[in-house]
């Protein structure tokens, strides 16, 4: 549903631009950082699962490249797009493109936690996701893994934010810096293990 609604909203925005509406569109990467611990804060929830040993194995191949962007950088990018963005332009507001292997190594270093080395094959992850989704329906909880999420893990999600950098002076922080801030916040609210 997430991808479908994103696609539909993008199509509507493009149609509005074509009709002369002065819109500026932004596309953030995978957003993380301090904020509500909701279903939408997927990376932070994932980090907490890692920190508390709730993930015996990692999903997705280590070489998959994703783009992670700190929440404050997205907010600054949106503000810059509102102030300086050219009507009709679309901007990718990303952070660093890193492999999943690099992400987990960095999470282990920054968070002082042991990260599993075992990788779950896609077919097993999909089956586990189906079971978790069914259990969540029965209990009213939020599944930690779903078949849709497993499908997302099967792809690269790397982006180039050079247009935003050139036109909006967009300068996101490093992944290490963002993770350090995020882990410090999680410690402060008592969610990260001591």
Where are these regions (language model features)?
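Short-chain dehydrogenase/reductase
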Residues: 1-10, 40-44, 64-68
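Conserved active-site helix of classical SDR/Rossmann-fold NAD(P)-dependent CH-OH oxidoreductases
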Residues: 7-14, 76
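Conserved beta-loop-beta element that borders a ligand/cofactor-binding pocket
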Residues: 11-34
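Short aromatic/basic micro-patch
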Residues: 25, 65-68, 97, 158
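Conserved sequence/active-site signature of Rossmann-fold short-chain dehydrogenase/reductase
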Residues: 31-33, 74, 98
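A conserved pocket-lining segment of Rossmann-fold NAD(P)-dependent short-chain dehydrogenase/reductase
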Residues: 46-69
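Mid/C-terminal beta-alpha module of Rossmann-like enzyme folds, strongest
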Residues: 77-144, 161, 174-194
